[in-house]
Amino acid sequence: MAKLTKAEFVSALKEMNIKEVMELIDGLKEEFGIDPTAVVAAAAAPAAEAAEEKTTFNVTLKSDGGNKLAVIKAVKDLLGLGLMDAKKLVESAPVLLKENVKKEEAEELKAKLTEAKAEITLD
């Protein structure tokens, strides 16, 4: 049997009618032992993993963004800290501000701190 190049195979495939293509597919499944249900199940697995969305986040202050005073005030108000504790926390950036908080709370904290020009990450 002569070896076909990819271009020759594609050209031959273009010339086939639907019935011939279906026979080719069935022959390939039989020849190589391909189980179509296994292929579908394997393809669906990554989609299921991607659907799982993270529900808790750690809020980390990366830097004060050059607006230290506003960030200290925001941290003080949002975390219920004293002024000195908030100042020490901001000055020790990067630092974890809150751990395992719900998505809504994490996004709210990020929005308010970003408004004060802080650099925040959620992970």
UniProtKB/Swiss-Prot annotation:
Signal sequence region: none
One GO-annotated biological process of the protein: translation
InterPro entries assigned to the protein according to its UniProt record, in alphabetical order: Ribosomal_bL12, Ribosomal_bL12_C, Ribosomal_bL12_C/ClpS-like, Ribosomal_bL12_oligo, Ribosomal_bL12_oligo_N_sf
Domain of life the protein comes from: Bacteria
Gene: rplL
Gene3D superfamilies for the chain: 3.30.1390.10, Single helix bin
GO molecular function, a single term: mRNA binding
Protein's UniProt name: Large ribosomal subunit protein bL12
The family this protein is said to belong to: Belongs to the bacterial ribosomal protein bL12 family.
Assembly mode: Homodimer. Part of the ribosomal stalk of the 50S ribosomal subunit. Forms a multimeric L10(L12)X complex, where L10 forms an elongated spine to which 2 to 4 L12 dimers bind in a sequential fashion. Binds GTP-bound translation factors.
One Pfam short name: Ribosomal_L12
SUPFAM superfamilies registered for this protein in UniProt: ClpS-like, Ribosomal protein L7/12, oligomerisation (N-terminal) domain
